[in-house]
Amino acid sequence: MITILDGGMGQELILRSGGKATPMWSLQALLDAPDLISQVHDDYFASGALVATANTYVILPDRLKHFGFPERQAELMQKACKIAIQARDNHGSGSVAGSLGPLGFSYQPDKCPEIDIAAPIYETAVKQQSEFVDFHILETMSSVKQVRGGLMGATSSTKPVWLAISVDDIDGSRLRSGENVKEVLPLVEEFGAQALLLNCSSPEAITKSIPLLSECRVPIGAYANGFINISDSFNKIGSTVDLLEKREDLTPVIYADFAEKWVDAGATLIGGCCEVGPAHIKELSTRWKG
């Protein structure tokens, strides 16, 4: 059975708001336009998604401190989770996932803190989410150190934890840190993660990478992004996603064609990341749910 996940949140919010990207990314919408977040969740469920991923990716101390309100983490975490829950309840079925983004910055594993610093941060985050979500998902983990720190903290939760790793867009056999993807597999078993996915990488890289997960004992999956590449200038908190260009060739049909290859390689969890929207999820749902 194939489980259809939702698609990207941040880029979809920018598209719908009609404004420019802001340094606070999807957090800006949580503060100023929560109804837009609700609409995105609703549209993903209507497109066939079985999971609403709460808009909590950037609700972490380093991001909040940078923007001047570190004391609001629990409040914002709860607000985002409740929006996802309401969408699930409106739809009448589905699950809610609590997103946990990388510390430091996305795609920049060299900026992540040491494991003994990261683990308690994620432990706090899952405590704030666990009352509301069905499971947590560590996203865009780009090095073995990021994975270990994330899993060490997140698996303190009583709820299941999924792990999603991001790979090099040229060499899909390697994490963005340069380490081999297979180095993550022992950590999945050590910490008891319930699923292992590839995320926020090009569909081509994921197609090369997913066969390397075949030895994993838990369900595997993938959700790619629709960026041309990850610009070197997109490298710090405060950078805006308008530094990243959208691919024009990644139509829903072509994206689903890539997903066919992932399923053939053993994936059972399929969705989308940045620049992959409701139309893409609808095509996935049509192919696998009929």
Language model feature labels by segment:
Residues 1-290:
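Domain-level signal for soluble alpha/beta catalytic cores
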